[in-house]
Amino acid sequence: MMDTPEHASTSSRRQLLGMLAAGGTTAVAGCTTITGGGDTTSTGGGDSGSSSIVVGSKGYGEQVTLGYVAYELLANTTNATLVDETGFGGNAAISEAYRTGNVHAYYDYMGSLWSSHPPKHDSADFDTPDAQYDALKSEMESEHPIRILDRADWQNTWAVFVAERAVEGTGIQSISDLAAHVNSRNYDIRPAFGDGFRSRSDGLDALLDYYEFDPERVTAWASEREFLETASAQAAGTAVDEGYADLGVGYSTSAWLTDVDSVRVLDDDRNFWPFFHPVGVVHEDVATDAVVAALNTMPDAIPDAETMQALNSRAAASGNQQAAADHLQNNDFI
């Protein structure tokens, strides 16, 4: 699961809540590898000095794939000996790991680092991704033995999506438009959301409050359309696709969103959720020019959310490492 932000009480404040994620790894050879005992090691090529680098990630699908993007870039462009610790754990585990040198390199999200890694912030009041990035980089590099590398231009945050059939002729393009629709006593759109999402601090009820949905209208809406709580965000997408619901909430780069036909992603026009752009994180002990250059390839290799979404879909079919290696090779990054 992705790390998620928390709702704020005013339109100018955005609060974040970091969630732990854990999971396994997929190891498919995309370069010269030696496997054994659960770890994968590789001796890369290129012109950096030889050193040992532990490559990590958090545990869910996109994070593991990004971990293997880092692994393949380092394996193919440096002389480092690599240790595969993709799927290492959630925020608490991986933040402890890079502070102690047990993980040297991985990609994380700005919102996760800001909210869930020491010193941890309960709020983020940034108008642009660059403002959040600058504050994050300054603080994290002064607090920890790491460097924050270049950020990508895309982000993986929550997305509100609605079936085209349900909004045809309404002009609904944004969450504010949806609020106006419901506040005008239109209850025709049935929402679906994952287990527990409605009451989360960054979930549906908080979103409705932030966007000033009239509480009486929301009560009437829920009574008339019976909000559908599903087992997961992906199941909510399936409910929309199969006509059991009209509106869902999921992750913006999830592979399953590509399988849902005829949906419209609504603009979070008041920035309820903050900026979750990926950035490279590297321990200062291994931050040579070659290592930094390799890891800074990611924003070019994955230039937009659509590319990440497609990569997630391929990873689900062929495995995280194979998908990462194929993508980098096919686009001449390794």
UniProtKB/Swiss-Prot annotation:
InterPro entries: ABC_Gly_betaine_transp_sub-bd. GO terms for biological process: chemotaxis. SUPFAM superfamilies: Periplasmic binding protein-like II. Keywords: Cell membrane, Chemotaxis, Membrane, Signal. It is found in: Cell membrane. Coiled coil: none annotated. It is a peripheral membrane protein. One of its GO terms (cellular component) is ATP-binding cassette (ABC) transporter complex. GO terms for molecular function: transmembrane transporter activity. Residues 1-29 form the signal peptide. Mediates chemotaxis towards compatible osmolytes. May function as a receptor that binds the osmolytes and transduces a signal to CosT. Has probably no additional role in transport. Belongs to the OsmX family. This is Chemotactic signal transduction system substrate-binding protein CosB. The lineage of its organism: Archaea, Methanobacteriati, Methanobacteriota, Stenosarchaea group, Halobacteria. The gene is cosB.
